[in-house]
Swiss-Prot record:
This protein's UniProt keywords: Amidation, Neuropeptide, Secreted
Superkingdom: Eukaryota
Physiological role: FMRFamides and FMRFamide-like peptides are neuropeptides.
Compartmental location: Secreted
Annotated family: Belongs to the FARP (FMRF amide related peptide) family.
Keyword RNA-binding: no
Gene Ontology biological process terms from the UniProt entry: neuropeptide signaling pathway
Residue(s) carrying Leucine amide: 9
Membrane-spanning intervals of the chain: none
Record's GO cellular component terms: extracellular region
Listed name of the protein: Extended FMRFamide-4
Amino acid sequence: GVDSSFLRL
């Protein structure tokens, strides 16, 4: 989800 994408940063 969105959280996963943010953690990838």
